[in-house]
Amino acid sequence: FTIMLITKTLILGQPILTSQAGSPDLVMEMLQSCGESLFNEDGSVNIVDNKALKPILEIYSQMVKDGTLVEVTDWDQYIASINNGTTAGVINGCWIMASITANDDQSGKWALTNMPKLDGIDGATNYSNNGGSSWAISSNCKKTDLAIDFMKSTFAGSTALYDDIIAKGALATWAPAGDSEAYAQPVAFFSDDPVYAKIVDFATKTPSNITGAFYYDARDAVGTALSNIIQTGADMDSELQTAQETVEFNMGN
């Protein structure tokens, strides 16, 4: 689930955020924080008429122009920009913490919080998600009842399991896990802040997202639109229309 990490040594004129050029990750996180998705409940594409997407692209573009957000060319540069002082903060899934905590010299220099809420968008929140993993029981399962019982007694029923795997770097957002003593432990790297309990709390407040088989087609189309807007100054409305039509074509509509 999405978090915002902020360095405690902000320098005047330093960008607040970093992002990989052409990647729609931050835009998607902002979109979900507003309770909006790239698809409607009936599965139709929701890009052109999305009430939050254009304002989000406008905000993103403005942040790039005024230097609030710095774009880098690839993932390695993205990670480097977080750790070498290029940027004062980062918004991403909680898994991004591992790229910071791997560097001992960063200990005590970072704080964790939720993400900013967009103004002027009904339903906007301070919470979102990016990435993660899920367990599912497929229709090919030969012992469905046994599989369901296993899931209920482990991943959906055992705080002891989550207490054990947190020490191995596996962070769950199952709400009851956040109430355990293991999750409430202070984390020295983050100045003894109980960041794991915080993250689970954030997860319980995150709006849902409508995905589906063509979700990444839609993400990629928005990423292309974003890249064209930032790099060539392309017209935003035209780019959103093209993105919508691209996804609809891929869906066979």
Give residue ranges: language-model regions.
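Glycine-centered hinge/linker elements that transmit conformational signals in sensory
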Residues: 1-6, 42-72
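Extracytoplasmic/periplasmic solute-binding protein
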Residues: 1-45, 87
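Short, solvent-exposed loop/beta-turn-alpha elements that line the ligand-binding surface or hinge
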Residues: 15-16, 36-55, 102-104, 117-127, ...
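Extracytoplasmic/periplasmic substrate-recognition and gating elements
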Residues: 62-68, 103-170, 204, 224
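Short helix-initiation/N-cap motifs at beta->coil->alpha
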Residues: 70-84
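Beta->alpha turn/N-cap motifs
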Residues: 75, 92-97, 133
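Alpha-to-beta junction loops
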Residues: 84-93, 108
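Long, aromatic- and glycine/proline-rich binding clefts that accommodate carbohydrate-like moieties
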Residues: 113, 165-221, 228
